[in-house]
Amino acid sequence: SFFTDADQQRLVAAIQAAERNTSGEIRVHVEQTCPAPDPLERAKEVFAMLHMHETVQQNGVLFYLTLDDRKFALLGDRGIDAVVPPGFWNATRDAMRDHLHAGRLVDGLVEGIQRAGEHLKAYFPYRRDDRNELSDEVSFG
């Protein structure tokens, strides 16, 4: 796989740190190439495939990335879309894009995950009774 064990551990640690701030659930899915013309459409398929829509607050966030063509998409569930302002993900996406275009894929994902945790904290603060509803492991397609 393109990501070393250390890379994957770094991503899992970033997800766990972000999820200490928010009840939002963050996942990363990586594929070699994007089978759809639009990475956002593929992200929607992956979101469903990973059962990310099954969180109690519908506040899952998927970071979708392809290695060959460096396409990526950020997708938040309905519960997030219902409460955040338009363009909520734009700053996160733009910050990631610079890293990804420079080939710093793990750095880009880590920065995106950190920002997602910070931004979601205002809308979905961490609750003491919160449980980890989705795996923190990176999934590969």
Segments predicted by a language model, with ranges:
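A structural boundary signal for the start of the first folded domain, especially the loop/turn
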Residues: 1-60, 65-141
